[in-house]
Amino acid sequence: MSSAVRIVEKQLDEILAIARNPAQIRNAGTLAHVDHGKTTTTDSLLMGAGLLSPKVAGKALAMDYVPIEQLRQMTVKAANISLYFEYGGKPYLINFVDTPGHVDFTGHVTRSLRVMDGGLVVVDAVEGVMTQTETVVRQALEEYVRPVLFINKIDRLIKELRLSPQEIQQRILTIVKDFNALIEMFAPPEFKDKWKIDPGKGQMAMGSALHKWGITIPMAQKAGIKFSNIIDAYEKGYVDQLAQEFPLYKTLLSMIIEHVPPPNVAQKYRIPRLWRGDLNSEVGKALLEADPNGPTVIAVSKVNKDPHAGLIVTGRVFSGTIREGDEIYIIGRKMKKKVLQTYIYMGPSRIIVPYMPAGNIVALMGVDEARAGDTLVDPRISDIPPFEKMRYIAEPVVTVAIEPKNPAELAKLVEALKDLVIEDPTLDLKIDQETGQILLSGVGTLHLEIATWLLKERSKTEFTVSPPLIRFRETVRERSQVWEGKSPNKHNRLYFYVEPLDETTIELIATKEITEDQDPRERAKILREKAGWDTDEARGIWAIDDRYFNVIVDKTSGIQYLREIRDYIVQGFRWATEAGPLAQEPIRGVKVVLVDAVVHEDPAHRGPAQIMPATKNAIFAAMLSAKPTVLEPLLRLDIKVAPDYIGAVTSVLNKHRGKILDMTQQEYMAYLRAELPVLESFTISDELRAAAAGKIFWSMQFSRWAPVPESMLLDLVKQLRKKKGLKEEIPKPTDFVEVY
């Protein structure tokens, strides 16, 4: 098999000819921890495809096409590109996605994985497998995306750490071992062994994206190259020769073509995981085969605002062929739209194509109402189930208030904000209808910094941004008594109690194992077997709040007119969970149970304006009598530091309510895993750097929600209430319901 990958400039008709043959398509992308060199690696591939000049590759950061990314040298959005290659005498089309590595942008990674079958995981040879590597590999494996490994920055082992050939070899083996441990931990059972990296089979490459060379073990054996030769190349100044003999793009593309499955193979095992429909139906069979002649089914992975073309929807065609002029149905939004134009991506530029068959990534104009995670289908099969919802690992926990300097520009600002939230569903926008206050929440301070920068660029308005505030959650610690909620007209009475929702059920909601729209019997069976629910209670679930993890259950029997007001009760429940009774923070992990009701016979007396407040007030009263508390977001820190500084680093963490979970020592580094409240994290970076005299790497990511220490609870609730202009004293159940 020839390892030559000939790269030639190809006309569109040739690209379309390959696009029709799934065996010659690969859908892959880069995944990595921040600063491990993903984008520089991708640039090297573009250079190989003749899309960047060799001088510029590695400096151009071509896929970082939002200007702030070039400024901060960091990928913020996931970018797409289609590359043409010849390998082993055959032409291939590689649809490539570059994804962000910074923890604040894991939402973009989640959306990219849906369209990929393979992930090129880039790991820094010095830092090794880090938190974010673990997060993206776990996300990839959850989406049944096969990982291959590129160990980057080998030059640092030679120039900075001055390691010997044996030490370099040992370092690489350690990284492969750590990487395979992640696969053992997170891979689907049937792929645990198959997907582990075997360097001898060419499933791992090593090299330097900066110096544009890369090599696999089989290539090195064939060419008789040893680590000592690579060290020589750096010490004697002939690294360029290394890049000529083993250009990185050839090595990585050969690896992708050989070890990432084509769509018609990958879809056989990915579709049963991503789609809950009947696999023996016409649609099911077409999806499993990636059949270009089957009914059209597209999974949307991202939506971008284009100043000239409106919203551009990008997704993967899993079955059928999409053409300009086709009508398409958006499942879940229950609407038909006409595709005005179809494109493929070449970096930031879109190239118009007449059609795109199954197995490829396509961009569409004209489907403005579609959002990331939606399923687009041929209108004739509009009743099929959509693809599984996407699971975002990080939650928006930091908020800023945004205010236009000129009130006349408010509408313009809000319009631009709404577009931002369409593009990035991990942003959360709240506009207070009464006060006009705009609150934007993101995964971290950096996420918000970039969102507000984009907002300024696009809205062309001047606005102020408040210092960041932490988002909290409200919950309960025990079961309440039953409380009566009365409608304002006194004609309807609803009786509820609340209790904590168990962690297993929260996890089932988070992993989408139970959803609001699945068959109630199937859902009840899962809850009974996995979370120990009572059958009747599990069947009585009316709604699942998968944003904040709450459920409402109907335990009544034989109540007249209850069915007519069910939707209003559910709306009242959702209204309550948005902002709880303690401090108007969202409610998390609460089971709301309806046990009785008296409903007026006349529909005019039992409308939403009567039922929704009765529901909300009873839930609030019940919560306040169930040992309510506030949950704060915690971050997980992974720290690598020189052993001499462990004491200093530990004391910084202790000062900020941090807790060390684990500590190990290897070679010349100590590894600490710790948890730290987000509330305490704003100055931690500078303090850690100072404590370890700069000799420290660390990364942070959202870990979990945990109750605020009892000693802080009262003061925190008062502070939150004061900030929101509420009276400081904590409300009592009787502030929401009448007690006789």
UniProtKB/Swiss-Prot annotation:
InterPro entries: EFG_II (IPR041095), EFG_III/V (IPR035647), EFG_V-like (IPR000640), EFTu-like_2 (IPR004161), P-loop_NTPase (IPR027417), Ribosomal_Su5_D2-typ_SF (IPR020568), Ribsml_uS5_D2-typ_fold_subgr (IPR014721), Small_GTP-bd (IPR005225). Its main location: cytoplasm. One of its GO terms (cellular component) is ribonucleoprotein complex. Residues 23-264 form the tr-type G domain. GO terms for molecular function: GTP binding; GTPase activity; translation elongation factor activity. SMART domains: EFG_C, EFG_IV. The modification Diphthamide is found at residue 605. Keywords: Cytoplasm, Elongation factor, GTP-binding, Nucleotide-binding, Protein biosynthesis. NCBIfam families: aEF-2, small_GTP. This is Elongation factor 2. The lineage of its organism: Archaea, Thermoproteota, Thermoprotei, Thermoproteales, Thermoproteaceae.
